[in-house]
Amino acid sequence: MPQENIKSKEIILSIDAGTQSIRAALIDTDGNILHIVKTPIQPYYSEHPGWAEQQPDYYWEMLCKTTGQLLQKQEHLKANIAGVTLTTQRATMINVDKDGKALRPAITWLDQRKADSCKILPGALRPVLKTVKLLDTVESAIQDCEANWICQQQPDIWEKTHKFLHLSGFFTHRLTGEFIDSVGNNIGYLPFNNKTYQWAGKYDFKWWLFKIEQEKLPAMIKPSEILGQITKKASLETGIPAGLPVFAAGSDKGCEILGSGCLTPETGCLSFGTIATFDVATPKYVELRPMIPPYPASVPDTYYTEVSIFRGFWMVSWFKEEFGLQECILAEKNNDVPEKLFDSLIQNVPAGSMGLMLQPYWTPGIGADSYAKGSIIGFGDVHNRAYLYRALLEGLIYGLREGGELTQRKTKVPVTKLKVSGGGSQSEAAMQITADIFGMAAERPHTFETSALGAAIDAAVGLKLYSDFPSAVRSMTRTGKVFEPSLKNHQLYDNLYKRVYLKMYGQLKPLFKEIKDITGYPK
């Protein structure tokens, strides 16, 4: 077990490259964040409508800047670093040559371009797939596969591609010189067998759906195993001591789940990030929807089932930009962040927002109808922007409750505990609304940096500082604040959820389709 004297403890350098920032943290074996540096990044740029790209070298420069600043400030702790670990945003894809040099901009997970499915999916097969209600799922997967688009639109780039990597794989090569990645990062439109945690077999239909040659894919290892060692070149650029082992972890969402202490399906893990998600960890392969598999966890031989709201707590940023000028001005004056002031904005708004109901489908999620749209109903003369903001939070959490109920039906395991992480969990109002809508206590971890912490847990197990994941989680995670539900508010929310929210999409769905047919939006 780890020693008690903090000066003699091993320290883990955890790098967390998210959508809006890159963090580097020094974390001890008790799960304490000893020091952290956060560098905001530009999530993407868009040269065409619907595109969302970023230069891979920009990501690397921001990573080097972040680790460099951290280790300059904490030079005295360098000798205590026992290992390095890495977690990144999901499904951001990069084409590289034999030297690991990017051949084109990264296509981020926010990108909405579509490949031509007609060039891949035979017309004769469409009626069959439609009969078994899988046509939309298969067609969407083909269209959303970044590799398919590149093959069709930039065949010269695809021909030059040596490896097609996640951002995590790109960083791993820059750090270690190896084309290798963690199974826990393998999320996206790739020929991967989620049941076996390996690339698909030779005759698997996924090779037909996703036009990727196997030799262009990296080697894969399990979370907590060693990816490689920091090279001398990487050391010069990042400030990380050469020779340190780099341990496989998982995606940023996956590491959030682990860092929140979720290891079994009885615990529901809510992530209040750009994407809002409801996940459970399970040893069993369970598809919540046909042909949409659970994804590999940050723990070996485990799956995460996930329901996501694509525009999750991004909605808070949307509200800030469109309706939050007053809070933005006040926050700048007081050197604060506007989001904190929104809690005060709604303190006098009653639970249920006097019937103002929001369904947060600003962008359709996985498995949703392509023409799905967000909606707000129930306006009256009492409603103002404060009511709108509370309705926004309530709508997001109604959506997560719906996801939680689907999860429990499919896993056949009741959720008895809620853990909430992500930037939005810093909102006291959002946490209380969560407890009230779900009707059970909502726990916030001891740190908001659960993604970096989850990656550090992988490294701690890999370093043999703990014998297994349960013991590492017991020692490195703990509950911060617990929000208990109000019975009165829960009864109100339960009625609004069952009698209104769950009926909204079905009632409005035909109108959403008409809107798309008339306006052509979304394409």
Please state what every model-predicted region is.
Residues 2-8, 231-240, 250-267:
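Conserved phosphate-binding catalytic cores of ATP/NTP-utilizing and phosphoryl-transfer enzymes
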Residues 37-77:
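N-terminal phosphate-binding loop and adjacent alpha-helix
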Residues 17-19, 130-251, 316, 359-360, ...:
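Gly/Ser/Thr-rich active-site cleft segment
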Residues 27-28, 94-97, 150-152, 173-174, ...:
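Short beta-strand-to-turn element immediately C-terminal to the catalytic PLP-Schiff-base lysine
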Residues 58-59, 123-139, 266-269, 461-475:
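A polyampholytic, Gly/Pro-enriched intrinsically disordered region
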Residues 2-39, 44-45, 82-120, 156, ...:
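Glycine/Thr-rich phosphate-binding loops that ligate phosphate moieties of nucleotide
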Residues 63-82, 154-158, 203-213, 238, ...:
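Phosphate/pyrophosphate-binding loops at sites that engage ATP/ADP/AMP, CoA/4′-phosphopantetheine
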